[in-house]
Curated annotation (Swiss-Prot):
Organism: Pongo abelii
Recorded topology in the membrane: Peripheral membrane protein
Catalytic activity: L-lysyl-[collagen] + 2-oxoglutarate + O2 = (5R)-5-hydroxy-L-lysyl-[collagen] + succinate + CO2; (5R)-5-hydroxy-L-lysyl-[collagen] + UDP-alpha-D-galactose = (5R)-5-O-(beta-D-galactosyl)-5-hydroxy-L-lysyl-[collagen] + UDP + H(+); (5R)-5-O-(beta-D-galactosyl)-5-hydroxy-L-lysyl-[collagen] + UDP-alpha-D-glucose = (5R)-5-O-[alpha-D-glucosyl-(1->2)-beta-D-galactosyl]-5-hydroxy-L-lysyl-[collagen] + UDP + H(+)
Binding site for Mn(2+): 112, 115, 253
Protein name: Multifunctional procollagen lysine hydroxylase and glycosyltransferase LH3
Signal peptide: 1-24
Annotated 2-oxoglutarate binding sites: 599, 656, 676, 729
Pfam families for this protein: 2OG-FeII_Oxy (PF03171), GT_PLOD (PF25342)
Any one GO cellular component localisation term in the record: endoplasmic reticulum
Location, primary (coarse class): endoplasmic reticulum
One GO BP: protein localization
């Protein structure tokens, strides 16, 4: 047998065998062994798996003629992934070769298909076969399988692989017929042992000119040789190079435990992706959803398995997906009591939007694996479920056409590539370690950064993916896909698909969105999203920075100057203002507005206010990051020639009330410049208030919520806080560059 993958697995090997020893001038016309028209590739496959279709795609690329044996038949050749077997392949080949028993001008290459890729042309294959001087050339490997005791009977080899591998051989039809007609064993007997014993017969080996491809000129078996193989990129083609023997193999065989490495190579060879042409096969199987017809029915499964920042925004994005909601059934599993209010707020909209909905809450006490099994099985058991779309709450799909795009890719399983903003952390692994955990593939960074764009066969995907419903029903009918082992649910899921020979595809052809970081999300805060400026800066900005801030920074005429050198610009969103005030009131320990202040190094405040420092609520670092990221650039734009490090020791929220502290006496600030942000609405939350700059006799009487006043501090801008006459006024103040 060949040391191949789970049976029925078949290997694709494309060697070429020599005609009888004779000079070119002695050969009759029509019997040129380098004539591709006289070459036939025979392979074996009982089902049109993705591996088989990949093999055919590579054969079609080079215009090979392929004959497949066994399609639609039952595999009775044993579990060749775990033990000996594969004899059924020899029986099928024996019968097929009867057709060519007298074809002396014909060359046959036999290869498996599920784990084989062709990397060279028929002409190259035939030339290399002729150069081998053989009538039948087998592929070679480093292991004597399945009987190590036969190793000593093999001829010594100076350089190269010593032992026969039956996953690929090439030879004259008459010679192959002479070999396989000797098969008289059972279907689950070992094919490789059969060929090995014939090869080890010295008389037969010499009589039939049997040889091994010791240096991988034609056949590259990957098992035991991964360190020898590298990708060789040409402008519009990719192949592998064996650096140990400096050869360019024509047939690449992922025998034994090297299926994932073959998948990696198959992303490139022969034209999966090239530096000049990009993705060569991406559009080959695409199927555009026809207009005017209802699109496929989708089961959308959403999982909230841990405390997750910005969940209300995630739920609102579900309503914006560019896909007819009447064709979507929503399943939502929430494992967190903390998020129940968020889901309750959005659930009426979700119920009205989608064709059907189901909510499973924390009271069900389902593990993440059990919840995922439940959702997937609901699709599996529904004949009308055409696609299963799994989406975790820590994904941010900014491309609203994601679902439509993935369906049109027409793959059994496909995920959109998502990564954390500015990080290499993503929702896929490019390779696995020997114990099936994360390993970084050579192209991982290029894929995450989209320097190489295409559709990729990877060993692990998570957090967002689409699966065909019929794939679940026919190829993965068991329910316990996620919870059937002790491993992480996503790892168990991926292994289940890999073990079935189902490819896990990843598309990075489009910008789909990003992932959220969740590990440091602290739900002890009243509004924990406020603290996400470091971990999830893009989402934080979208939620908490004023929608017109960027336009103001770009000089689009939004910034105002109500007083000399006093600039007014939009900075914080309404939500940021509200949550900042709520955090302060929730903390509740307002200073008394006295001169004595134990929070200060000297214990004395010259111009006291009723306030709470950012440091008191644990928000100092986050606020300083806001100053660096948003206030610093604006300051340098408004005051040309000044460079700020946006340092501030005093950052605090001030509360003005008529019965508490209604105003603030004239003073200079201990800063190079001061930031003063209104946190609520005049006329709605309070009356009065405002700021007067005494030297210029200039008053700003109606501060706008979320807008910041930016002005010089010490020396020039002597100012006072005007009395608040009704309600409560809140402002955020920073003394920057003291």
């Amino acid at each position: 047998m060949t040391s191949s993958g789970p049976g029925p697995r078949f290997l694709l090997l494309l060697p070429l065998l020599l005609p009888p020893a004779a000079s070119a001038s002695d050969r009759p016309r029509g019997r040129d062994p380098v004539n591709p028209e006289k070459l036939l590739v025979i392979t074996v496959a009982t089902a049109e798996t993705e591996g088989y279709l990949r093999f055919l795609r590579s054969a079609e690329f080079f215009n090979y003629t392929v004959r497949t044996l066994g399609l639609g038949e039952e595999w009775r050749g044993g579990d060749v992934a775990r033990t000996v077997g594969g004899g059924q392949k020899v029986r099928w080949l024996k019968k097929e070769m009867e057709k060519y028993a007298d074809r002396e001008d014909m060359i046959i290459m036999f290869v498996d298909s599920y784990d084989v890729i062709l990397a060279g042309s028929p002409t190259e294959l035939l030339k290399k076969f002729v150069q081998s001087g053989s009538r039948l050339l087998f592929s070679a490997e480093s292991f004597c399988w399945p009987e190590w005791g036969l190793a000593e009977q093999y001829p010594e080899v100076g350089t190269g692989k010593r032992f026969l591998n039956s996953g690929g051989f090439i030879g004259f039809a008459t010679t192959i017929h002479q070999i396989v007609r000797q098969w008289k064993y059972k279907d689950d007997d070992d094919d490789q042992l059969f060929y090995t014993r014939l090869y080890l017969d010295p008389g037969l080996r010499e009589k039939l000119s049997l040889n091994l491809d010791h240096k991988s000129r034609i056949f590259q078996n990957l098992n035991g040789a991964l360190d020898e193989v590298v990708l060789k990129f040409d402008r519009n083609r990719v192949r592998i190079r064996n650096v140990a023997y400096d050869t360019l193999p024509v047939v690449v065989h992922g025998n034994g435990p090297t299926k994932l490495q073959l998948n990696y190579l198959g992303n490139y060879v022969p034209k999966g992706w090239t530096p000049e042409g990009g993705c060569g096969f991406c559009n080959q199987d695409r199927r555009t959803l026809p207009g005017g017809q209802p699109p496929p029915r989708v089961f959308l499964a959403v999982f909230v398995e841990q405390p997750t920042p910005f969940l209300p925004r995630f739920l609102q994005r579900l309503l914006l997906l560019d896909y007819p909601p009447d064709r979507v059934t929503l399943f939502l599993h929430n494992n967190e009591v903390f998020h129940e209010p968020h889901i309750a707020d959005s659930w009426p909209q979700l119920q009205d939007h989608f064709s059907a909905v189901k909510l499973v809450g924390p009271e069900e006490a389902l593990s993440p694996g059990e919840a995922r099994d439940m959702a997937m099985d609901l699709c599996r058991q529904d004949p009308e479920c055409e696609f299963y779309f799994s989406l975790d709450a820590d994904t941010v799909l900014t491309n609203l056409q994601t679902l439509r795009i993935l369906i049109e890719e027409n793959r059994k399983v496909i995920a959109p590539m998502l990564s954390r903003h500015g990080k290499l952390w993503s929702n896929f692994w490019g390779a696995l370690s020997p114990d099936e955990y994360y390993a970084r593939s050579e192209d991982y960074v290029e894929l995450v950064q989209r320097k190489r764009v295409g559709v990729w066969n990877v060993p692990y995907i998570s957090q967002a993916y689409v699966i065909r419903g019929d794939t679940l029903r026919t190829e993965l009918p068991q329910r316990d896909v996620f919870s059937g082992s002790d491993t992480d649910p996503d790892m168990a899921f991926c292994k289940s698909f890999r073990d079935k020979g189902i490819f896990l595809h990843l598309s990075n052809q489009h910008e789909f969105g990003r992932l959220l970081a969740t590990s440091r999300y602290d739900t002890e805060h009243l509004h924990p999203d406020l603290w996400q400026i470091f971990d999830n800066p893009v989402d934080w900005k979208e939620q908490y920075i004023h929608e017109n801030y960027s336009r103001a920074l770009e000089g689009e005429g939004i910034v105002e100057q109500p007083c000399p050198d006093v600039y007014w610009f939009p900075l914080l969103s309404e939500q940021m203002c509200d949550e900042l005030v709520a955090e302060m009131e929730h903390y509740g320990q307002w200073s008394g507005g006295r001169h004595e202040d134990s929070r200060l190094a000297g214990g004395y405040e010259n111009v006291p206010t009723v306030d709470i420092h950012m440091k008191q609520v644990g928000y100092e670092d986050q606020w300083l990051q806001l100053l660096r990221t948003y206030v610093g650039p604006m300051t340098e734009s408004l005051f040309p020639g000044y460079h700020t490090k946006a340092r501030a020791v005093m950052n605090f929220v001030v509360r003005y009330r008529p019965d508490e502290q209604p105003s603030l006496r004239p003073h200079h600030d201990s800063s190079t410049f001061t930031l003063n942000v209104a946190l609520n609405h005049k006329g709605l939350d309070y009356e009065g208030g405002g700021c007067r700059f005494l030297r210029y006799d200039c008053v700003i009487s109606s501060p706008r919520k979320g807008w910041a006043l930016l002005h010089p501090g010490r020396l020039t801008h002597y100012h006072e806080g005007l009395p608040t006459t009704w309600g409560t006024r809140y402002i955020m103040v920073s003394f920057v560059d003291p």
